[in-house]
């Protein structure tokens, strides 16, 4: 019975350790002198951030094809329906669709090949808000895009030099108007 109990405890701790080392937190801060409504897929939906506010978004382990972008010029009613001048996602505050161009995108896939997170910035869909994406540990590369056609971002789909990696379990900071 002791062996069975020990094995159960071991596998429980292993499962918890595996989950926590792969999940990531994205702290999204608006430093712009205007309101930004960040949106996140496939988790997170959307939120309003005035200058200086931060939204902490916990992204589950194994998330692939994640996107975060800023929306501008938004107006929503009490039920979360409305529209945005840039980055609109079907007229709702809590996005379930990608944003309409132009959108500066932060893209990520967590715990992929060799236990790495992959991340990038993209202006393929256009540029709307200056953005910086920085891993908070691991000595990984910080990406900054202050204007259209910025050198740190994807400009065309097959630009394989723009994807970066960091060990799984890394947390990230995304800043609008860094």
Per-region residue spans from a language model:
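Extracellular low-complexity, O-glycosylation-prone Ser/Thr/Pro/Gly-rich "stalks"
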Residues: 2-178
């Amino acid at each position: 019975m002791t062996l069975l109990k020990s094995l159960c405890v071991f596998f429980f701790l292993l499962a918890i350790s595996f989950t926590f080392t792969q999940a990531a937190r994205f702290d999204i801060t608006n430093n712009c002198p205007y309101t930004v409504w960040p949106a996140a897929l496939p988790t997170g939906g959307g939120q309003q951030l005035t200058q200086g506010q931060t939204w902490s978004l916990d992204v589950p382990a194994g998330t692939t094809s994640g996107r975060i972008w800023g929306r501008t010029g938004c107006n929503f009613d009490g039920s979360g329906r409305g529209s945005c001048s840039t980055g609109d996602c079907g007229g709702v505050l809590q996005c379930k669709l990608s944003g309409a161009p132009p959108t500066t995108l932060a893209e990520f896939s967590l715990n992929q090949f060799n236990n790495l997170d992959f991340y990038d910035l993209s202006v393929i869909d256009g540029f709307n808000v200056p953005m910086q994406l920085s891993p908070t540990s691991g000595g990984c590369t910080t990406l900054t895009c202050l204007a259209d056609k910025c050198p740190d971002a994807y400009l065309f789909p097959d630009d394989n030099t723009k994807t970066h990696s960091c060990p799984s379990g890394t947390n990230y900071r995304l800043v609008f108007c860094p």
